[in-house]
Regions:
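Solvent-exposed loop/turn segments at secondary-structure junctions
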Residues: 78-80, 107-110, 213, 302-305, ...
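Bacterial Sec-dependent N-terminal signal peptides
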Residues: 1, 7-52, 58-60, 484
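Structured, acidic catalytic/metal-binding patches in enzyme active sites
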Residues: 58-266
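A cross-kingdom marker for long, charged
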Residues: 269-345
Length: 776
């Protein structure tokens, strides 16, 4: 057999990033190249595989078994470095002469997959941790008095961050640029270039693996080996010099690559699921297309190719002839440039934000990728052209603070030059339907980017489009920016009193005008915010919001909390103490406040109502000084209603069942359920490695979970703690211990409690806990 050449693209690992800078949670990033590298002895890098076969090359021809035309297999490295772009004419000939192009997974489904995983993890807890670390646990360090009711105007630094901060996941999906090494990179990582080339050349582009299957296999790879006595490390293994991998790839030496993979693999289970099982799936995919009478160009991580269980041997075992294609490193730049110049035609259709505030025409849906620093980001990645469409939103609270859209537009104008990336090519200001800015820039790489910033009475909405070269300057960019619309019903109002009584929900209020913001109609909304404005802005702006603060260990005095909340609200606008009037909306403590702004002499009125962990704030700002008594007096707390009925929920981790409202219960995907079981197995085996006394394993059985109702702000916390037998000598000692726990070490008073034995193995205790000077 001739020399066997395969491209050395290290193990096709999916890296799970724990970076949560802008994701309100653990944003899991797709990355099919994972550097598990540092330093190791040089001689280890030259270790050979267990097979005597030689795998030399990157491009392989697949023929035989009745195929009319050969297919091709190419080993990639999932990075944009120039090293991997030494592509000869044989590469492009094979690519152009194929009916299909396949990658490990279909890039077109990445965004939807990541969104599904994000939603499941946020709802049910992170699957790979066994589902235990659910979000929104208790109060997430909320500053109830200092920040929760501080409806302030954005600081200039927030605007600066909004403009300078690149869309989360855009680089991960489209470029994989290293930042400092961008002068030594091409426009995208090699796999996506092949994906784009297939699209632009009219090929059918597919994934050899499903996203669910690939992700599950990669997660299974973290399960420790049964016979591994070393301390658990999911990404263990020894380390190697990263240059060893690059050198092996440059030499097209797949045997060396396979050996390097063996060195860095944490164990047999890691290698099985990260490589072996996935290799079988990839080979099956190639085989299925060949049986259809079609030929295909398949590109997978080079580490998947060599060895007895590599894709090459998998195909040979199925009866195919697989041989290396002579492949030089004389880069065919002409072919590459021709493909890069092609614009893949995309159909732009109208897309809406989750709350229908804005719409724009784009190639696909916008997915929320970040919600941090008060800035919400949504992204639509055009994988075929390497372009992205993004929308940023930042609440200004302008109707409450008195900062008009025109004023905020001027504030923004003063920082555009400093904070918008690149050299400004064109800059326009507009005033209709709202004030804003239209800016076109060119980055140091020569990429055109365009920004459209719109300032509505309540928020700043910024639209961005970016891409390689002058892509944004084409018709797609014009169509996107010309199609942007702000929904009039979401930014203006009519003078018609409106009764709002959400179902499910437990409030009722009569707003003097129709609301242009009403999150109570959105079942996915995590906050309650209702707002409307008189036709003449001077006549009044009205809003209702709810802050949830669940503190099960302490109950503050009602009067103290009401006073400090009202004073904190007022101190943003005046140095004088507000006028405070305590009230009682039986059994809920209330307080109204009023003051006049020192700056613009506007009048502020508010009412705070406390219902257990729920704090309601009704507010009004006007220039007439007329108190909105009718609005405040219309507010009621009503019994919760659940029109969709109830259903039973089972939690296998907590080992309990409970009845929950139907519309509150989102079903976890099958992938999530599988990942959760894998996570539990990982945790169990990891715990078993900590000492012989089993202490870690014992405490690791603790459970913490919660059930949340976004519509009402209610939360139920579930905690379980296993006790060894005879920890409590009798029932009285058990009750004394739980009394202490329920009363927060006797800091609060137990108003009533029950003690009930159910059968021989269960005792049920209930507690109602109170504290002095509080109705809660």
């Amino acid at each position: 057999m001739t020399n066997e050449n395969v491209k050395v693209g290290v193990t096709a690992l999916i890296r799970i990033s724990k970076n949560s800078n802008f994701q309100s949670n653990k944003l899991m990033q797709l990355r099919t190249f994972y550097f598990l590298l540092l330093l190791v002895l040089g001689q280890q890098a030259t270790a050979q595989t267990n097979t005597n076969k030689r795998y030399q090359g990157l491009l392989w021809e697949i023929s035989g078994k009745g195929t009319a035309r050969p297919s091709y297999l190419y080993g990639t490295m999932h990075v944009p470095e120039k090293l991997v772009y030494n592509l000869s004419d044989s590469f492009f000939i094979a690519l152009r002469n194929s009916d299909y192009v396949s990658l490990e997974t279909d890039h077109d489904v990445w965004q939807e997959f990541m969104q599904k995983m994000k939603e499941d993890n946020e709802t049910f807890g992170y699957a790979e941790n066994g589902g235990y670390a659910a979000r929104n646990n208790y109060n997430n360090y909320t500053d109830l008095y200092g920040q929760s009711f501080k409806l302030e105007a954005p600081d200039t630094r927030l605007f600066e961050a909004m403009f300078a901060y690149k869309p989360v996941m855009a680089n991960e999906f489209l470029y994989r640029s290293n930042g400092f090494g961008e002068d030594f990179e091409e426009n995208t990582y090699l796999d996506l270039f092949i994906f784009q080339a297939g699209k632009k050349l009219g090929k059918k582009v597919i994934g050899l693996e499903t996203m669910d299957g690939s992700y599950e296999a990669v997660t299974r790879a973290r399960i420790p080996d049964d016979d591994d006595q070393e301390e658990y490390n999911p990404y263990g293994g020894r380390y190697i010099n990263p240059n060893s991998i690059r050198d092996a790839y440059r030499k097209q030496d797949l045997n060396a690559l396979d050996s390097l993979n063996s060195i860095i693999s944490p164990g047999k289970n890691f290698r099985k699921w990260m490589l072996e099982e996935r290799n079988i799936v990839m080979a099956n995919g190639i085989d299925s297309i060949a049986k259809m009478g079609k030929n295909m160009f398949s590109a997978v991580g080079a580490a998947h190719l060599a060895g007895d269980i590599g894709v090459i041997e998998q195909l040979r075992n199925r009866g195919y002839t697989v041989r290396a294609v002579q492949f030089s490193f004389d880069t065919d730049k002409k072919n590459m440039a021709e493909i890069e110049k092609i614009r893949y035609p995309v159909n732009l259709s109208q897309q809406w934000s989750n709350d229908s505030v804005w719409s724009a025409e784009a190639p696909g849906k916008f997915y929320t990728t970040s919600e941090a620093w008060r800035i919400e980001q949504s992204l639509c990645a055009d994988m075929s052209n390497g372009a992205y469409y993004a929308a940023y939103r930042l609440k200004t609270n302008g109707l409450w603070t008195g900062q008009t859209p025109e004023y905020i537009s001027t504030r923004i104008d003063s920082i555009i030059y400093e904070k918008i990336p690149g050299k400004i090519q064109e800059r326009k200001r507009f005033t209709s339907p709202f004030p804003g800015h239209d800016i076109t820039t060119k980055t140091r790489r020569g990429d055109i980017q365009r920004y459209k910033i719109i300032i509505t009475p309540s928020e700043v909405v910024m639209f961005i489009m970016g891409g390689n070269g002058d892509y944004v300057a084409g018709k797609e960019g014009d169509q996107f920016f010309n199609s942007i619309r702000i929904n009039p019903s979401k930014s203006t109002t009519v003078e018609r009193a409106t009764i709002i009584e959400p179902k499910p929900g437990n409030i009722k209020v009569k707003l003097p005008v129709s609301p242009f913001i009403n999150t109570s109609t959105d079942k996915k909304a995590t906050e309650l915010y209702i707002a409307g404005q008189e036709k003449n802005p001077d006549d009044g702006y009205y809003f209702l919001t709810r802050i949830s603060y669940h503190d099960i260990d302490y109950i503050e005095e009602d009067t103290f909390e009401l006073n400090i909340i009202c004073e904190k609200i007022a101190e943003q606008f005046t140095k004088s103490r507000p006028t405070l009037t305590p009230g009682q909306m039986m059994p809920y403590p209330t307080q109204t406040f009023s003051f006049q702004s020192d700056k613009d002499k506007s009048y502020y009125f508010g009412k705070v109502v406390i219902d257990g962990p729920q704090y309601y704030l009704l507010g009004c700002r006007n220039t007439t000084g007329k108190s909105p008594d009718a609005f405040f007096n219309s507010f009621e707390i009503t019994p919760s209603t659940w029109p969709d009925g109830w259903m039973e929920k089972k939690d296998t981790s907590g080992e309990y069942t409970v009845m929950v409202p139907k519309n509150e219960e989102k079903q976890a995907s099958q992938l999530y359920q599988n990942l959760k079981k894998i996570g539990e197995e990982i945790a169990k085996k990891a715990r078993a490695k900590y000492g012989d006394n089993g202490d870690y394993d014992f405490y690791g059985k603790n459970y913490s979970g919660q059930i949340v109702s976004p519509q009402t702000g209610e939360k139920v916390f579930i905690n379980s703690y296993p006790y060894e037998s005879r920890v409590f000598p009798d029932k009285d000692s058990l009750k004394r211990s739980t009394d202490t726990y329920a009363s927060a070490d006797k800091e609060m008073k137990i108003k009533s409690s029950t003690f009930e034995e159910k059968g021989d193995s269960m005792i049920v205790m209930t507690y109602e806990v109170v504290d002095t000077n509080s109705n809660r």
